Curated annotation (Swiss-Prot):
Matches recorded under Gene3D superfamilies: 3.30.70.260, 3.40.50.1360
Higher taxonomy: Archaea, Methanobacteriati, Methanobacteriota, Stenosarchaea group, Halobacteria
Entry's Gene Ontology BP terms: D-ribose metabolic process; pentose-phosphate shunt, non-oxidative branch
Catalytic activity: aldehydo-D-ribose 5-phosphate = D-ribulose 5-phosphate
Gene behind the chain: rpiA
Keyword match DNA-binding: no
Any one GO CC term of the record: cytosol
Positions of region (Disordered): 1-23
InterPro entries: NagB/RpiA_transferase-like, Ribose5P_isomerase_typA_subgr, Ribose5P_isomerase_type_A
Active site: E120 (proton acceptor)
PANTHER family reported for this sequence: RIBOSE-5-PHOSPHATE ISOMERASE
Family: Belongs to the ribose 5-phosphate isomerase family.
Protein name per the record: Ribose-5-phosphate isomerase A
Signal peptide extent: none
Subunit comment: Homodimer.
Length: 240
């Protein structure tokens, strides 16, 4: 489920900071969520001023916003196919970011509050550089929020049992504006799985990834190259 917290001004500073690193001719992965939306809008402004880029959307929502902002779009297959140059940079938000000593270390993330984490991970992992944008409310010493797990509809019960066996408590994500569950852009369901403090995100990531019926989960380990954290006065950048 989506997280709240952090001012819109802080989110805007983070998103715009990452957008300013994009250079002419690049293919850009366009993330999902309120902070990533600020990056998309800033990129749209830069396109209006002559920046030559192409975007790869991570969700229906980011595709719609990019189109509104005048950013030319590619499908993922067009961007990473055998005749393509690849994705140069991806900019995406996070629901929680583990920070290291002195808030300068890039740690693992939890994503998927918008139920787009399967495509987000595909795009973000394909990029040469992956920049995370967030506000301070998303920072934590240890990941502890529920992990979104996208599952095949037929595998919901089996995956739920596997999550319980791994020490988690799964909850089917319900839609807010219609009866029934959330259905992802891929036609699947989402289990929000509470594990408490996640001492070993890498191990849990492996466990979930190897569970039959799991399409993708929201733990991102070792993917982020930079984290841009917007504050009330500026932007703090951590680099790997």
């Amino acid at each position: 489920m989506k997280t709240s917290g952090g001012s819109d001004a802080a989110k805007r500073r983070a998103g715009e900071s990452a957008a300013e690193t994009v250079t002419d001719g690049e293919v850009v992965g366009l993330g999902t969520g309120s902070t990533a939306a600020h990056a998309i809008r800033r990129l749209g402004d830069r396109v209006d001023s002559g920046l030559d880029i192409r975007g790869v959307a991570t969700s229906f929502a980011s595709r719609e916003l990019a189109a509104e902002c005048g950013i030319p779009l590619l499908d993922l297959d067009e961007a990473v196919g055998s005749d393509a140059t690849g994705i140069d940079i991806a900019i995406d938000g996070a629901d929680q970011v583990a920070v290291g000593e002195g808030e300068s270390e890039v740690g693992p993330l939890i994503k998927g509050g918008g139920a787009a984490h399967a495509r987000e991970k595909l795009v973000d992992a394909s990029a040469d550089r992956f920049l995370v944008v967030a506000d301070p409310s998303k920072e934590t010493p240890v990941l502890n929020r529920s992990v979104p797990v996208e599952v095949l509809p037929a595998g919901r019960s089996a995956v739920a049992e596997a999550v319980r066996a791994a020490g988690g408590e799964p909850t089917l994500r319900r839609a807010e504006r219609k009866d029934g569950p959330v259905v992802t852009d891929n036609g699947n369901l989402v289990l929000d799985c509470a594990f408490g403090e996640i001492a070993d995100p890498d191990a849990l990531s492996t466990t979930l990834s190897t569970t039959p019926g799991v399409v993708e989960h929201g733990i991102f380990v070792g993917l982020a190259d930079e984290v841009h954290v917007g504050t009330e006065t500026g932007v703090r950048v951590a680099r790997r």
